Amino acid sequence: MATVNLTELVATTLRNRSKDYADNVSKGNALLTKLSSSGNVKSASGGRTIVQELEYAENATFKYYSGYETFDIAPTDVFDAAEYNWKQAAVVVSASGLEVNVMTTGKEATLNLLEKRISNSMKTMRNNVSIGIYSDGTGSSSKQITGLQAQIADDPTSGTVGGINRANWSFWRNQIGSAANISSTTLPGLMKAMWLACQRGPDVAKLIVADSIRFTDYWDSLTTIQRITREDKGMMGWETLAFLSAEVVYDGDSGLPAEHMYFLNTDYLFWRPHTSVNMVPLDRRDSLNQDAFLVPVVFAGNLTMSNAARQGVIFDSA
């Protein structure tokens, strides 16, 4: 009977399940779930940085005129771009010679071992990317994803995001709302104020993500009749409450900072994986000094933003 080639099975299965990796990561994070359902997963084909076009000023040539009065044709810089660094991540599926040649016998046992290793690696990638999405980007010596704590900051008047210095450019500052000892009594007022601060005409927050404390405060503030969940196919698999037209989501064990609630206009947030480096396996590597082999699964990309003023965060100042 032919010996089952575990190393080839690992490589082949990982190649076939590359899309499963990407989907698993997206579905394991509330923000990525929303971005995926709304078409804001935009792959990037390469370059020194990930360039995200943005709009930061109105066109100054607008004017009322009469008869033969001339138009204002002066050039106006309306669009600029933020530049985000590529962030890379990897998880490794490995097996030793003992597992391949001694302990694993038969195709069924081989496939079971393979499935467990792949499942574990998918969960590991999902959990760590999710933590990165909500991070301040300083983890792993600043190699972590540029997450919400960096882009929608408690202090948006300082720091550089996407190559733009917020101390110099007020258009690149998010909205903030804070109070000491926020409770279920005081939170609704802060949420109303934040909603209005982030709104521009019909342009409003689409998703509100909160840690367990702020989510519970909001939940407790609602009457039974108000505790409405909406049938939104874009957030399938997530239990949500409603605040006006936005879903309110608790994203547990995700790295959300304590006592924070983010108001996200997801029209201006993007998940930008590299076109060909999005949870894909590399070629098998054989260890030089061990009886083992490994297959890395790699990712390159980042979270980007095109409009900071339409985003906001509520946090406790105590």
Stretches found by the model and what they are:
Residues M1-A318:
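Flexible, glycine/threonine- and acidic-rich loop/arm segments that mediate assembly and lattice contacts
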